Amino acid sequence: MEDYTKAEILIEALPYICKFHDQKFLIKYGGHAMVNEQARSWIAKDLVLLKYVGINPIVVHGGGPEINRAMEKMGKKPEFIHGLRVTDEETLDIVKMVLIGKINGDIVSKLERYGGKAVGLSGKSGQLIKAKKKIQYLMKDSQKIEVDLGMVGEVEHVDTKLIDILVEKRYIPVISPIGVDHQGNDLNLNADIAAGDIAGAMDAKKLIMVTDVDGIMDDVNDQSTLHRRLTISQIEDMIEKGLITGGMIPKIEACINALDKGVQSVHIVNGKTPHAVLLEIFTEDGVGTMIVRE
């Protein structure tokens, strides 16, 4: 690559660096995007670079595949309803062990390896996430019935003070999605939905979902059907047509929730694409799907 071409690539990022300087970006780092060591390095480098050019990344991570593996090793079969993990007491212990005890620390170490300053948290830290037990309903024989997900929660309140302090001190907060109810009980939170709630509470400019798909497509096997930009109404139409199903539904709910709470745009990118976060933010075309209100 010629020097001029290298300079052109850098200059393309300048308007975006100026536009987003001192803004908060919530990065939801999905468990399926963590399975590749090279991909983990790309994401870590991207986040450290964001911090050094004056953008404030805040990370919420999942860990579904590792939780599933840990459960299977212990003889438990993972169970999901509408993309949400059914969580009994033993499952919750496994979830906390994997998320807080392993994945969170791994992400912090990776960020620090590439020159960043990072701090690992969970929703339990400093009463960060107050949650309540989630009530889930299903349609059966044209009737709405309540199903018990166990110790699964939904966010009631996010206390941003601790995150604000860390961001001001130039740290990258890395948050495990475990909440606490008013009786002090731990609750398992869907990482996508928690990320949307935290993004809204933090007045984040963007929510970026780093996962293992390129974005939202009409046909997951046909890259040419990738949507670069969608509105909420277009998303809802795709759900009605059955083009968005299963585990993607909580992601979309999180996206819409974040937009409803003031986040300006949500982006879904593939963590296995080299430096997907930088390419989505700092180039005109991006590499994933951007979702906006209208």
Curated annotation (Swiss-Prot):
Cellular compartment(s): Cytoplasm
Catalytic activity: N-acetyl-L-glutamate + ATP = N-acetyl-L-glutamyl 5-phosphate + ADP
Positions bound to substrate: G63, G64, R85, N188
EC number, UniProt record: 2.7.2.8
GO cellular component labels: cytoplasm
SUPFAM superfamilies the UniProt entry points to: Carbamate kinase-like
Entry keyword annotation includes Cell cycle: no
Protein name: Acetylglutamate kinase
Cited function: Catalyzes the ATP-dependent phosphorylation of N-acetyl-L-glutamate.
Gene3D superfamilies linked: Acetylglutamate kinase-like
Pathway connected to this protein: Amino-acid biosynthesis; L-arginine biosynthesis; N(2)-acetyl-L-ornithine from L-glutamate: step 2/4
Site note Transition state stabilizer, residues: K28, K251
ATP-binding keyword on record: yes
GO molecular function terms listed in the Swiss-Prot or TrEMBL record: acetylglutamate kinase activity; ATP binding
Entry's Gene Ontology BP terms: arginine biosynthetic process via ornithine; L-arginine biosynthetic process
Pfam family for this entry, one: AA_kinase
Keywords: Amino-acid biosynthesis, Arginine biosynthesis, ATP-binding, Cytoplasm, Kinase, Nucleotide-binding, Transferase
Annotated InterPro entries: AceGlu_kinase-like_sf, AcgluKinase_fam, ArgB, Asp/Glu/Uridylate_kinase, Glu/AcGlu_kinase, NAGK-C
Record-stated family: Belongs to the acetylglutamate kinase family. ArgB subfamily.
